[in-house]
Amino acid sequence: MSRLFQKEDDIVALATPFFSSALCVIRSSGVSAIEKFSKMFSDPSKLLEASGHTIHYGYILDNETKEKLDEVVVCLYRAPKSFTGQDSIEVMAHGSLIGIRRIIDFFLKVGFRMAEPGEFTLRSFLAGKLDLTKAEAINELISAKTRQVHALAVNKLSGSLFDKIDLIKKDILNFLSAISVYLDYETDDNEVVIPVDIILKSKSELERLIDSYDTARKLENGVTLVLAGSVNVGKSSLFNLLLKEDRAIVSSYAGTTRDYIQASFEFDGILFNVFDTAGLRETSDFVEQLGIVRSNSLIKEASLIFYVVDLSGKLTDDDLKFIDAYKEDSRVLFVLNKVDLEQNNQTVEFFNSNNVVSLNTVKISTKTLFGINSLYDRIRSLIAVDYMKTSDYDVVISSTRQAELLKRAYALIIELLSKIEQNISYDMLAFDVYEVVNVLGEITGEVTSDDVLDNMFKNFCLGK
């Protein structure tokens, strides 16, 4: 049965991760949540008589043997002034794994059932405590991996997206009102002037929201950064430097990295998925050959490529092949490493020559850290267009569901403008206007189906 029809059940779930910790939070909600929980609390009358938004100290007890299970602090909320709009109990207990299991078992014994993923937030939505844009923002907030994504989710949780959609809806309904006035007072002597500017404004707002989706997805997925180059040029040293930890083995032996190593780091609030790849060279080692094939595949799919060159050594045939193939590729930054060593004159002259002077290059030393700030500046400039333009938008869309609905609304607006241009009967335009409003209502949840809600909330984590 759909969770929409089980909202009177008393539910319980662990709201914090299930591992040993100082504290954990177990949350519950339901019509009889306080009454049922009181049966396993050391002072039941105190809870039954307590007002909402109060905190109580006591013990979780086995209601049959009166054995103390844990010393706890209980937050009590009474309907309708709670997250779910129902009576709710949140228990702060010690984060012992066996203790958590035993406490939840006793919740189940007194009549609670385990909550399904997202069920607390679903109940909050059904109680009118939040709209769907805020519900989705909660999920985005929990799963945020970087400061920028986190900030965007907080912005939507504060109601920015709902307000934007609501404003567009009001503009479109104002357009409908204007048509109605013209129809009421239209005479043969008066030419009806449709306020197309209102629809054009809505079209522009929808375009911006749809455009923001690509930026949001890039921020969530992060930058795929591939470190490529010949063997022993310092790729693994650069990998460790970017991560600020020793993840890759650094050795003077060629071919130490035989397959790629992947890790993530955050830079300026943006997620980077960085790959340290096998050095490009001719080799008879089968495993290393596979690593090089994978390296080439990663290079083709990368958002950014740092091709590392050893300025103290000669350029290899693989270096020259790569430079020729990727010299006009805007994703590539040639990182000229080992400037702290005596430099190879031929290599230096090559990068100073007219043929390659236009290459995007930066000189560094992973050993002395020379040029590292310049490298960071180059990273900023390389990702600025695609990953650092969130300030261009007052609201950013990151939900696929929202993006698809916005595209539907935009298509309907385009169709509406076409009908206006064709002088379609004004009373017929009202049907199209209402269709746009309904689609926008699906974004906020004012118009939606049970199946949509079930599918959306099942992707939430337990306890939320």
Swiss-Prot record:
State where Mg(2+) binds. Answer: 236, 257
Binding residues for K(+)? 251
Pfam families in the cross-refs: MMR_HSR1, MnmE_helical, TrmE_N
Task: Identify which top EC class this enzyme belongs to.
Answer: hydrolase
Q: What is its main location?
A: cytoplasm
A biological process from GO: tRNA methylation
Q: Which domain of life is it from?
A: Bacteria
**Claim: Coiled coil is one of the keywords in the record:** no
**According to its UniProt record, where is this protein located?**
Cytoplasm
**Record has Repeat as a keyword:** no
Note on cofactor:
Binds 1 potassium ion per subunit.
Q: Which cofactor does it need?
A: K(+)
| EC number(s) given by UniProt | 3.6.-.-
Which Gene Ontology cellular component terms are annotated? cytosol
- State how it assembles: Homodimer. Heterotetramer of two MnmE and two MnmG subunits.
NCBIfam families hit by this protein: mnmE_trmE_thdF (TIGR00450), small_GTP (TIGR00231)
* Family of the protein in this entry: Belongs to the TRAFAC class TrmE-Era-EngA-EngB-Septin-like GTPase superfamily. TrmE GTPase family.
- Could you tell me what this protein does? Exhibits a very high intrinsic GTPase hydrolysis rate. Involved in the addition of a carboxymethylaminomethyl (cmnm) group at the wobble position (U34) of certain tRNAs, forming tRNA-cmnm(5)s(2)U34.
**Can you name this protein?**
tRNA modification GTPase MnmE
Q: Which organism is it from?
A: Borrelia duttonii (strain Ly)
